[in-house]
């Protein structure tokens, strides 16, 4: 059956659910697609289709970020269901790097939990512009005063990570809204959430003037057709049969884009902000991997050594409890890459303490596509310890 063409009739926006494990992110994602399927005829995804990997089903948790789509009155949304499980924050980082707005899910009976804060911190670091809160499982809280306390706690957490205290907080039960035959009262919270997203999230400004760049998130083989890479177009425009380079980690390789898809619909061109799958000519799956980029030939080069300005998180912000020294070897996160590197400190600086702002020189074990201004996070032992951006390319 021939695939249908993707029609750009509404503003396209990338959003996602973040929050602590078991607070109801995936249930809410399923409830939204269910509501929009009824209202607009979109495809509905059931909970167990979103938690789609065998390990996720067995453990009942989301590990890999999952992309969904639905539409509201104003927009076409691409929705990322982000994992809440601590081991999988790496995927949260790459998922959040694609968000134009975030939906923070907080369970009313539990309130703000450690991962709620970690996800807010990550959202701030990777540049999610604004957050809406869905206060879930409110049917399990009988005391209105307790709900008010949780709401206040959520607003404090938002303000603590640089988001607005006036953020809309939508209250409801995603589980009740998801049930077949949910009453209009039970489904009202989803309608309210979509209306809040349409009005509170600003239309994203797309960077389509700069040369094309897509950060590779996943690689697939489609039998009989070839290798497909998926990811979000960071900037620029890509058209069918255009030449691109695969840059970073391995030697740079040229190829041609022979197919462009978004949510199983065909595109003639992909533009900045689109989550797409690109079919590459003559590329074996082994030759390309997550963390590389596809780019306009000659527009970006791979580098291993750079200068960066970083802020080191304090203990209170979830960072290290002690300083680090010359030769420190953490994990550097750039776009969808995480890679080991060594830190050299400026002359006359012996150590860097939590809470410090400092210049560093980073040297990576593999080259990655890099230019001035690229944002980075530094992580160690499962937590973010610093964030910043590249100020100079050295090698």
UniProtKB/Swiss-Prot annotation:
Domain tr-type G: 10-205
Chain residue ranges for the region called G5: 173-175
Subunit: Monomer.
InterPro entries: EF-Tu_GTP-bd, EF-Tu_GTPase, EFTu-like_2, EFTU_2, G_TR_CS, P-loop_NTPase, Small_GTP-bd, T_Tr_GTP-bd_dom
Region (G4): 136-139
Localisation per UniProt entry: Cytoplasm
Coiled-coil parts of chain: none
The protein, known as: Elongation factor Tu
Family as reported in the entry's similarity comment: Belongs to the TRAFAC class translation factor GTPase superfamily. Classic translation factor GTPase family. EF-Tu/EF-1A subfamily.
Record gene name: tuf
HAMAP family assigned: EF_Tu_B
UniProt lineage: Bacteria, Pseudomonadati, Spirochaetota, Spirochaetia, Spirochaetales
Role of this protein: GTP hydrolase that promotes the GTP-dependent binding of aminoacyl-tRNA to the A-site of ribosomes during protein biosynthesis.
Catalytic activity: GTP + H2O = GDP + phosphate + H(+)
Region (G1): 19-26
Region annotation (G3) ranges: 81-84
